[in-house]
Design a protein with these regions (language model features):
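Extracytoplasmic small-molecule ligand-binding "clamshell" domains
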Residues: 38-106, 258, 267
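Periplasmic-binding protein-like
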Residues: 47-49, 124-131, 212-250, 268-283
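Ligand-binding cleft/hinge of the Venus flytrap
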Residues: 55-56, 71-77, 158-181, 211-215
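Short helices/loops that flank or line small-molecule/ion binding pockets
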Residues: 72-76, 84-85, 89-102, 116-117, ...
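Ligand-binding clefts/hinges and TM-proximal coupling segments of bilobed small-molecule sensing domains
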Residues: 80, 157-173, 253-283
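Flexible hinge/capping segments at coil-to-helix
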Residues: 132-150
Length: 283
């Protein structure tokens, strides 16, 4: 977690494809069609949120459910997806500046974001609360955060949840919530590990994964039976690029239909977030 790298140079998904090509070919039942550089799709993403997307032990190879989905979709489309590491709050500006073609990351499809870009929804998830192992501050939902310090990722939908909880605390005559915002999820999670923050608000599959794996499961817990903001994740595409949007949707639905999509999610233990169909702007 905290030892995961921060920003890296752009990672060409073809390098990832080489590592996963055999598995993907078995899943997708399609031969890899090499893409010319001009046909590459540049995908902006945060790169430190396992098991969805993160660097492997070599520090250069991307891995995770999003990476494998991108590889399988590349096979379907015959176009290589190139991942570019960008802080979460820089993803939409990068899209607007045409520095990337898509966002393929843990970005919720929300009505507010739909005003700026279109989404191809590929996964369902919510928000869970990550706390220190043993939950020493006895966090049991949003109403127990009054007077506490929490951490979030800048620009994430979790900030809205914190704002609502803060307002509820103050309305009840209690102390508000201090929100520490960070560009990188690993930095935000570190605040919980060190005790500076009581809670990190993060995406459910990542929080569950970290609670099980960080420090062999001895660093974090998730607050049980609490999940908020059930919203789909979407691949973001510029509104004027409907051809790419529709191609992404078609490739993803093909993977859903032939079973490859579910097998990829099962490989990473996140099949609970599977969608039945890839919809456009379903959030």
């Amino acid at each position: 977690m905290s030892n995961l790298p921060h920003l890296r140079p752009p990672i060409v998904a073809s390098a990832v494809l080489r590592a996963t090509a055999a598995a993907v070919c078995l899943l997708a039942g399609a031969a890899f069609a090499p893409a010319h550089a001009a046909d590459a799709i540049t995908a902006g993403s945060i790169t430190n949120s396992p098991p969805m997307i993160s660097y492997a032990a070599d520090g250069t190879t991307l891995q995770g459910a999003i990476v494998d989905l991108a590889a399988a979709m590349s096979l379907q489309m015959g176009r290589t997806i190139v991942f570019k590491a960008i802080p979460f709050n820089g993803l939409l500006p990068a899209m607007q500046a045409k520095n990337i073609d898509i966002t393929f990351t843990l970005m919720n499809d929300t009505p507010e974001r739909q005003k700026v870009i279109d989404f191809v929804d590929f996964f369902n998830l919510g928000t869970k609360l990550l706390v220190q192992k043993g939950n020493p501050q006895h966090i049991d939902g949003l109403d127990t955060l009054c007077g506490k310090t929490v951490s979030t990722v800048q620009g994430s939908t979790q900030n809205l949840l914190v704002d609502e909880a803060d307002a509820a605390c103050k309305k009840a005559g209690k102390a508000g919530i201090e929100n520490l915002k960070y560009a990188q999820p690993s930095d935000a999670r570190m605040q919980v590990q060190t005790g500076r923050a009581a809670v990190f608000f993060g995406n459910s599959p990542v929080m569950v994964y970290l609670a099980k794996t960080a420090g062999d499961g001895k660093i974090f817990d998730v607050v049980a039976n609490r999940e908020y903001q059930p919203v789909p994740l979407g691949i973001g595409v510029a509104k004027d690029n409907t051809a790419l949007r529709d191609a992404l949707q078609k490739s993803l639905n093909a993977l859903i239909a032939d079973g490859s999509y579910l097998k990829i999610l099962e490989k990473h233990g996140v099949e609970g977030g599977a969608v039945k169909t890839a919809t456009i702007n379903g959030g």
